């Protein structure tokens, strides 16, 4: 039998990225924070639901803050320093997620609202009667 050459386990080298983008999608039910490089390749992400919040607590500003802290801490392995923030959606976690990214230690260079606004497209959901 032929001897198979053993492969030595290679350590995966993380690419170093100085500038990145943070995409915050704040819906009424959840907040999703994705940190990408300049080309849009995801480096890390976190959600309010994945951070341990369930039900109505998912849609709180504190849950968005925890999600942003988790995504920011995971992206620090790539050497990120500056973030450009894109916020989408009307949810309660918009501002607290930005503040949390700032508190993690990133320098926020730009904040852009990219909430999609229809040009009289689909009919919106009916108003809630509580």
From Swiss-Prot:
Protein name, UniProt field: Small ribosomal subunit protein uS11
Role summary: Located on the platform of the 30S subunit, it bridges several disparate RNA helices of the 16S rRNA. Forms part of the Shine-Dalgarno cleft in the 70S ribosome.
Ribosomal protein recorded as keyword: yes
GO molecular function: rRNA binding; structural constituent of ribosome
Native organism: Shewanella baltica (strain OS155 / ATCC BAA-1091)
PROSITE patterns the UniProt entry points to: RIBOSOMAL_S11
An annotated GO cellular component: ribosome
Stored InterPro entries: Ribosomal_uS11, Ribosomal_uS11_bac-type, Ribosomal_uS11_CS, Ribosomal_uS11_sf
Keyword RNA-binding attached: yes
GO BP term, example: translation
NCBIfam families (UniProt xref): PRK05309.1, uS11_bact
Keywords: Ribonucleoprotein, Ribosomal protein, RNA-binding, rRNA-binding
Record Pfam families: Ribosomal_S11 (PF00411)
Family: Belongs to the universal ribosomal protein uS11 family.
Quaternary structure (record): Part of the 30S ribosomal subunit. Interacts with proteins S7 and S18. Binds to IF-3.
